[in-house]
């Protein structure tokens, strides 16, 4: 048997094995009475969801990676992994400001400026309820996407 043929046979066996494991795993998951009946004729078997986000700015967008900014900013941040297997997307990277203050050109903290988290609301798909493996709901989620500098609020004693 040729190497190409052997690898395609191996791939086919691997796919069959994973399908068998999936079917076996699906049979074990207990179904709540609140779950929709997936065997019913009127149950929608396939749903196509377009999750692509189109860039309305086209070629005007900089090709510079966002990771360049998190270190060069006067309000630097770190990215933290937020993982939830019952959510799509299951992994979301969230920003957290490194300091309460901003960093000046010399790399020292500027006590006249505050570092503030920039947040963006996104939509995610959440599995609902946990006992219904094929049911999802749309949920809003507030995600930190970066940090910026703002002037400190100075209150004068009267």
Swiss-Prot record:
Disruption phenotype: Mutant mice are born at the expected Mendelian ratio, are fertile, and have no apparent phenotypic abnormalities. They are protected against chronic autoimmune and allergic reactions, as observed in models of spontaneous or induced rheumatoid arthritis, experimental autoimmune encephalomyelitis and chemical allergen-induced contact hypersensitivity. In a model of acute intestinal injury, mutant mice show epithelial disruption, presence of abscesses associated with enhanced bleeding into the mucosal lumen and increased cellular infiltrate into the submucosal layer. Glycans are attached at residue 71. The keyword Ion transport does not apply. The keyword Transferase does not apply. It is found in: Secreted. One of its GO terms (molecular function) is cytokine activity. GO terms for cellular component: external side of plasma membrane; extracellular space. InterPro entries: Cystine-knot_cytokine (IPR029034), IL-17_chr (IPR020440), IL-17_fam (IPR010345). Expressed by Th17 cell lineage (at protein level). The expression pattern reflects the differentiation state, with IL17A-IL17F heterodimers produced at higher levels than IL17A-IL17A and IL17F-IL17F dimers in fully differentiated Th17 cells. Expressed in innate lymphoid cells (at protein level). Expressed in gamma-delta T cell subsets (at protein level). Expressed in iNKT cells (at protein level). This is Interleukin-17A. It comes from Mus musculus. The gene is Il17a.
């Amino acid at each position: 048997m040729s190497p190409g043929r052997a690898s395609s046979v191996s791939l086919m066996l691997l796919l069959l094995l994973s399908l068998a494991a999936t079917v076996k795993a699906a049979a074990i998951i207990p179904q709540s009475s609140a779950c929709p009946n997936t065997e019913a004729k009127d149950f929608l078997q396939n749903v196509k969801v377009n999750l692509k986000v189109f860039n309305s700015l086209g070629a005007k967008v900089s090709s510079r990676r966002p990771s360049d900014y998190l270190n060069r900013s006067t309000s630097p941040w770190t990215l933290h992994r937020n993982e939830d297997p019952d959510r799509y997307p299951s992994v979301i990277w969230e920003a957290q400001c490194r300091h309460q203050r901003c960093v000046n050109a010399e790399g020292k903290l500027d006590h006249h400026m505050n570092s503030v988290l920039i947040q963006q609301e996104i939509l995610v798909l959440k599995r609902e309820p946990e006992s219904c493996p094929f049911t999802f709901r749309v949920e809003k989620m507030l995600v930190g996407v970066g940090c910026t500098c703002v002037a400190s609020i100075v209150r004068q004693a009267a």
